Amino acid sequence: MVLLYVPPVQNLLRREVTAYASKATGMQIQVERIDLRFPLNLLVRGVEVIQQPDTLLSLESLNVRVQAWPLIKGKVEVDEVTLSRVAVNSADLMEGMKIKGVLGRFFLQSHGVDLSNELAVINQVELSDTHMQLLMNDTTTTPKDTTASAPINWKVALHQLKLKNVSFSMQLPADSMRMTAHIGEAAINNAQADLKNQYYDLKKFLLSGTSASYDTGTAQPTEGFDASH
């Protein structure tokens, strides 16, 4: 176990694992650097997954810092999860849909996740310069799942959420429907969710520089209210 913290061993494992994964999947998988520091501080840089002619994933950096001792007590203390400059393209991996987009920066800090009591405190979440597209090629409905699911009793407290320059678009070519939404800036402070009792509240919600659009069909928009645009 101690050997995992030795840089030459980390480099050897990085080369062997990426070579095996590339051969097993038929993709070109590259990882520039993997750095694991004591006790649980993981840094990954320069990830690229290519399935010709598409680049399915490129990631500049991922940094995860988790406190080790609380895990023994069934608690999770996340000092940092940071993702920087990520690009995804599902290409033809998922039947009936395609996801493509970029993520500029994502940051999460969470102190107070109690697994046994189903409690979670999320101190800070930030997402910026992120733009995702969803293209649905098949609108066939799937049978409703009637299997009973286990009850969810989690209580979640979110102290601070910030969004900046975030957009999402969805297109259904079969019926020419297009939806887009862009958030210039948004912030949520002191939000709570009790999933068992379906109770939700928040103290502050701020939104600015935001737009949304909905279009269906190929006809040009008409003056006044137009339900298709």
Regions found by a protein language model. Give the residues of each.
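N-terminal type II signal-anchor transmembrane helix
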Residues: M1-G26
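Flexible beta-edge/linker motif
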Residues: R33-M136, P151-Q171, H182, A187-T216, ...
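Short aromatic-enriched loop/helix-cap "lid" or pocket-rim segments at secondary-structure transitions
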Residues: N137-T140, A219
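Intrinsically disordered, low-complexity segments enriched in small/polar residues
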Residues: T139-A148
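Short, intrinsically disordered, charge-balanced linker/junction segments flanking boundaries
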Residues: Q220-H229
